[in-house]
């Protein structure tokens, strides 16, 4: 099958550090190529892939200090795709809704994975207008605000089976990995660690929009002797960070669409303490891969008993549910359905 993957340009595919969407696009693309499909990846020029790469920008836009208007690069990339859309059996978009006016008018089968939160009022009229656009959710919880969208299915993220190795013996610290932002609540993670008496290591990026939150809420807590902020991590450094952790703290305060770090932790054998929001009940298995909580008191109690969980079971759940092979199998089912429907509509 000839497949186009159209990625955001904010990060490279895969990203050097933080970047959940681009990371998933990379895993999906590489597994499709491994299975023999003809894949073209539209992404930033510093992306690394075994697919055919069509650069939409010279490098990832977040790391390009000279880039002022990121949207301009995305529009040019979409026009580039449109000019060769007939070369593909299926086009898979990961750029939110930017392409909807274009894809509504093209004949190539297409589907869009929605990677972000959908409980934003501004999205309601947009999805009423573009209710014909075929979309995929990354959790069932994510799609709840848009029940009437043209859902083709839910496909949970998956990562390569051998990307992270199993770490049977934990270290002596809690891990927090992600973005420093109000909805990720690293301040909660610090308080949990303080009450339990276990050190916390924070590996996270800080976007410009979150600098005020960092300065006002998080930075005053960093001098605590049990807190270590190490910045962004990637690759083997990330595996070591997660795999050696006593547990991953995921104290979110928003309707998390998926939470990629949870399955990355599972792949290492590291259990999770997560607030029961958004996708968390779909991704985690209570009393097996960790504990779900609703408040600080429950989080502290969970942290005190997390050592009783099997790290091997965490790894097993990852292998059973969250590999790239399973993700590709699910997407191929959707691609096939879209292509067949398009052929039937064209009278083929």
Segments predicted by a language model, with ranges:
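Catalytic cores of nucleotide-sugar-dependent glycosyltransferases that transfer UDP/GDP/TDP-activated
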Residues: 1-348
């Amino acid at each position: 099958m000839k497949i186009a993957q159209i990625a955001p340009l904010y990060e490279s595919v895969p990203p050097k550090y933080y970047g959940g969407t681009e990371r998933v696009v990379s895993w999906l693309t590489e597994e499709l190529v491994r299975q023999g499909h003809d894949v073209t990846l539209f992404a930033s020029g510093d992306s690394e892939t075994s697919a055919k790469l069509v650069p939409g920008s010279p490098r990832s836009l977040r790391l390009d200090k000279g880039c002022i208007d990121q949207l301009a690069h995305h529009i040019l990339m979409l026009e580039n795709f449109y000019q060769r859309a007939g070369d593909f059996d299926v086009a898979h978009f990961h750029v939110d809704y930017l392409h909807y006016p274009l894809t509504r008018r093209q004949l190539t089968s297409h589907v869009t994975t929605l990677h972000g939160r959908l409980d934003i009022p501004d999205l309601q009229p947009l999805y009423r207008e573009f209710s014909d656009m075929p979309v995929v959710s990354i959790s069932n919880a994510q799609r709840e605000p848009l029940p009437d969208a043209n859902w083709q299915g839910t496909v949970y993220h998956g990562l390569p089976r051998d990307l992270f190795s199993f770490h049977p013996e934990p270290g002596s610290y809690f891990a927090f990995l992600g973005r420093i932002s109000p909805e990720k609540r690293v301040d909660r993670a610090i308080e949990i660690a303080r009450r339990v008496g276990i050190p916390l290591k924070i590996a996270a990026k800080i976007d410009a929009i979150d600098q005020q939150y960092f300065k006002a809420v998080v930075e005053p807590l960093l001098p605590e002797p049990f807190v270590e902020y190490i910045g962004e991590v990637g690759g083997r450094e990330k595996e070591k960070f997660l795999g050696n952790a006593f547990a991953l703290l995921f104290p979110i305060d928003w309707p998390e669409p998926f939470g990629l770090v949870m399955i990355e932790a599972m792949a290492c054998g590291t259990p999770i303490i997560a607030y029961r929001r958004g996708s968390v009940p779909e991704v985690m298995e209570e009393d097996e891969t960790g504990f779900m909580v609703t408040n600080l008191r429950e989080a502290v109690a969970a942290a005190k008993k997390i050592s009783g969980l099997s790290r091997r079971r965490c790894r097993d759940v990852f292998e059973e549910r969250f590999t790239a092979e399973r993700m590709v199998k699910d997407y191929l089912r959707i691609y096939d359905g879209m292509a067949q429907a398009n052929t039937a509509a064209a009278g083929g």
